[in-house]
Amino acid sequence: MKDFYARVTVMVTGLCFVGTVTNPSRKSSLSLHQQDGDLLANWSSTRHTSQKTDTVDRNSYFFRVLFQPHTKERHTNHLDRTNHRLSKVTLSCLAHLRALEMLNLGDDVIHSLCLDLSLPSSSRQKRHRSRFRGRHPRLKVLLLQRNQLGPTPKGLWKLKPLCSLDLSFNRRVGIGLSGFHGCLQLKSIYLKNNKILTIHPEAFKGLKKLQVVDLRSSALTMLVPIVTIALEWPNLELGLADNQWQCNESDANFQNIASVSWGEIWKAVCNTPVENEKPYVEASQIRISRDIHLPRSPSSDLQSLIQSKAEKPRAGMDVHLSALEKKAQVGYGDLKGIWLQSPMELRDSQGGPVTDRKDDKPPDLALAVCLSVFITFVVAFCLGAFARPYIDRLRQQRCLNKRPGSENAYSNEGFHDDVEAAQHVQHQGTDLCQTTHHLNLFENQDPSWGTEAIPHGAVLSERMLGSNGMDPSSQQSPGQFEDSGEARSGDGNMFPNGRVVHPAVHGLPSADAQKPISPGQHHYDVPEESLYDTVAQEYSLLDNAMDRSSVAGCLGTFPNSINSGRDELCPSQPRDVVASFSKTLAHMSTREAEESVERGFPEPLGAMGSQIESSEERQVSNSIRELATQQASFQEVDVEERLAHVYSEALYNDTPSHMPRHSSGHDVASATEEAVQRDASFDPHDDLVTNYESDSDEGSLFTLSSEGSQDTRSLTEEQAFVESGGDSQPLPSRNLGEYKDSVTSAESVEDITSQQTLEKREAQEAHLGNTLISGPDSCVHETHLENDSSPLDPENVPTWTQPPDHKLAHHETLGTFVYGDIGPQSEAVDWLYSLRDLEFPNIDSSPSPPCSDQDPSDPEEHDTK
C-alpha cells in the first residue's frame, strides 16, 4: 500500500508542475519484424520540434516510465528517441524495459553514453536484485547515428544479444582492441563517415558472426589491417570507398597473394581518386579463393602475419567496394536498409556475389587496328557497290556528249537532203514548160512536203499512193503509173499524175446529165507524151509525180471525170453563154495550129473534118501561146490573179461541166483548204473501189464540134472505164499526117488581132464570174508549149515513140493535152531532154499590161459588138 500512495503523490506533483501528463506531441512508431532469424526495423519520425516541447516530453517520459505498471513495461519493444537534443544518456534507467528490442537515439547531441547496468548497493536495491538481473535481454539494434560520440561506448559488451550497431556520422578517430570485444552476436557494424585513422588488426577479434563492416568516407590510409581483417573473415563485406589509401610495394605483394580478380579490384581502389567516387554506389563483390598461392619470397612486413594466420582456414572473402562523396550527409532513413539487412540480403540486393569478375582490360592495339581495317574495307566496298551504277551512267553521258561527229553527221544528213532537194528542182526544170515554174504554179517544189500551194487546187496525198498500190521505194513503168492515176481520176478527185483534184466549177450540171455516153466512147486516146520515164530512177515516186504534173500542165488540158456529186453542186447554166465563149476558144486554137505549123510541129486532125473547126482550134492554141509570152509579168502579180487570168482562157464545152473556172485568191485558198479537209478523211481502199464503180457509169469526153461558122460549138468531155476482166481497152491510134490538111485555113484567121481576143475573153470572164463558182479543180486546163522570149530548140523539143498508124482523135488539138481515163500503156516511153533544160533562165519578155478590172458586160451585148 505504501508504494501505491507514493506513486499517486508523485503523479499529482508532476501534473501540477507540468500542467498535463499526456503522451508526447510527436509520436513515433517502431515496428520490429523477424524474418529468417534477422531483425528488420522500420520507423518514422518528425524532427522539427521546439526545445520546450523536448523538455516537456523528456520529463513526462521519465515520469511515465517511472509510474508505468510492470505489466505494460514488458510489452514495449521499440523505443525511438531521435531528435530530442539529448546530450548524455544512461541506459540504467531503462533497465525495467525488459521487452525492448530496438532503441533509436539518433539525431541528438549525445556525446556520452553510459551502458553500465550494474545493480545499486543500497538495501532497497539489494531487495530487488533478482528483479534487475539480466536487464535488456532482448535489445538487438542500437542506433546512435548523427551524434557527437568519440570513442566506442563503454559497457557495450554487456549487451549480449546486440546484433547491429550504427555509429555513422560521429567523431570516432580510431578503433581499438577492446572496442567491440565481448559482442559475440554482433553481425553488422556501420562506421561510415567518421574520422577513423587507424584500425587495430584485432579490433574485430572474436566476432565470428561479423558479416558487414562499413568504413566508407573515413580517413583510412593503411591497407595492412584491412588485409588482415579480410583474411580473418573471408565472407566479410568491407566498404572501403572514399578513403585516401596509400598503395606501396607491400600492397603489390598482397596482390600476388590474392587471386587475380582481387588484384584487379585492389589496383582500381589504389588508382581511383576520392573526388571521382559517387555516393552510395556499390562496387562489385570479389571473393578471394581459399587456395591462395603465397609468393616464394613475401615481404618482411607480411611474413609474420601470414605465418600467424597459416593455421586458420582460408575460405575466401568478398570485398565490397562502393563510392561516396565526402560532403554527402547520410540520414537515418538512408541507412536503415543497410543496418538491419543480413549479409545475404545485401548480396542479393547488389545483384548477387560475382566470382572471378574481371575489370576492363587495357585496349589491345592489334585488335583495334584489325577492326578498323575491316570496317574500312566493308564501308569502301559498300560505297563502291552503290556508287558504281551512277558512275557508269555519268561516264556514258559524258561519252555521248563528247562523241565526235555526232552533230556533224546530223548536219551532213541535212545538207545531203538539201542537195538532193536542189537536184529535184533541177530535174523539174527539164520539162518543156519552163514557164510553169516561172509562173510559180507550184510554190513548193520539195516533193517531201505533204501539202503544196498548187494553183489547180490539187493536193498531193500520200494516201492516194497507198490506195493505188504504189510503193515509193520501187520504180514503176509509165503504164503502171497511168493505171494508178486512172483509178483516181475516175471520180474527179485526182489527176493521173497523182495529184488530188477537186471540182472547180460550181453551179453547172454535169455532162452526163444532159448527154448519154455511147459505149464506144469509154476510152479515148491520151497522148503518149504524158508518159515519160523518170529522169533518174533513184528519185522517189513523189518526184516523178511532181515532174509529170508540171509537164502535163504545159502540154495540154486536164479534163476531169464527172461524178454524181457534181450534179448537186453545179446548177444549170444557159448554153448560149458557153457557146459564145467556145467561139473565142476556137479562134485561139486556130492561131495555135498555124504557129505550130510554122515551128514544125505536127498539127492534129479534127474529127469533124471541118476547116472552120481547125481554124478555131488553132485560134485557141494561138491565144494560149500569146498568153505564155507574158510570163515575166505574171511573176510579179499575185499567184491567184495569174491563175485566174490563165484559167479564163481554157477551152470549155457548151456543157456546164466544162465551163472555165473563175476564182479569186480567196476562192483558191478556200478551195485548197477544202481539198485538204476532204483528203484528210479519205480512205484509200474505199475510194479505190468507189472509183471503179463510178468509172463504169460515168466518164468524160473532150471533143470539139462545130455546127456552123457562128453557131454553137461545144467541147464535150467524157471518161469511161470498162471493167471487163479488170483490163482497159487498147487506145486508138493516131495519124499525125492526116491532120496536116486542116492547116490551110489558118491564114484567114491570123488577121484577128490579139487585142480583140483579149477583150472578148475579158467580157466573157466578167459574165462568167457572176454565175460560176470556181474551185480548186478545173475540167480543162490548157497551156502553150513554149515562150516567145525563149523559143524551144529542136533539142529541147520532147520526142516520143508512136505507132505509125497513130491518128489524132477529133477532140485533140495541137498544144493541148487531155487527161481522161488513162489505161495502162503496153510500151515504155522514153523522155529525151537536154542539159539546157536543167537551168531556169530568166525570161526577159516585156510584161503585159494587167487585166482590166472593168465591169463585166452582157454576152448578148458582146455579140452585137
Curated annotation (Swiss-Prot):
GO annotations of cellular component type: membrane
Residue ranges of domain LRRNT in the record: 728-759
Compositionally biased spans, kind Basic and acidic residues: 675-688
Stretches forming LRR repeats: 138-160, 161-182, 185-206, 209-230, 235-255
Polar residues compositional bias, start-end: 470-479, 702-713
Biased composition (Acidic residues): 855-865
Record keywords: Glycoprotein, Leucine-rich repeat, Membrane, Phosphoprotein, Repeat, Transmembrane, Transmembrane helix
UniProt-annotated glycosylation sites, renumbered to this chain: 42, 248, 787
Keyword Transmembrane tagged: yes
Subcellular location(s) of the protein: Membrane
Regions crossing the membrane: 4-24, 366-386
Membrane disposition: Multi-pass membrane protein
Residues recorded with modification Phosphoserine: 714, 748
InterPro entries on file: Leu-rich_rpt, LRR_dom_sf, LRR_TM_domain-containing
Region (Disordered): 463-522, 654-749, 840-865
Name of the protein this chain belongs to: Leucine-rich repeat-containing protein 66
Native source species: Rattus norvegicus
Lineage of producing organism: Eukaryota, Metazoa, Chordata, Craniata, Vertebrata
